[in-house]
Amino acid sequence: MVELNHNVVSFKSDTLIKGNHGVLVAVFVTKKGSGSNKVEFRNGINASATPVECTIFTAIEGNYQNIHSRFENGIFADCDGAAEVTVVFK
């Protein structure tokens, strides 16, 4: 269930999800990638940001809910592959 104060973004490549602090709530892999594709969610605003807070492997479709991981410096999705991903955040 998505509450009213949540935001949603879908992507297939590296994406800045939020430019300042936020909380990653859920990840939905809506179209699988191939092989060892993955999405690394980084605490920052670009692909060189550290640390990696969370990694989701996208070789299969799936729903990952109730993550509630807090990012202090932004949420950046560093994508490896061509899976389609939808993220719920606040």
Q: What are the language-model segments listed below?
A:
Residues 51-59:
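Solvent-exposed serine/threonine-rich low-complexity stretches and specific carbohydrate-binding patches
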Residues 1-21, 32, 78-90:
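C-terminal interaction-tip segments
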Residues 61-69:
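Exposed aromatic-hydrophobic patches
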Residues 25-27, 68-81:
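Noncatalytic modules at the cell exterior or secretory-pathway interfaces
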Residues 34-51, 86-88:
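Short, surface-exposed beta-strand/strand-loop-strand elements in extracellular ectodomains
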Residues 43-44, 56-57, 78-79, 88:
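Beta-strand-rich, repetitive solenoid scaffolds
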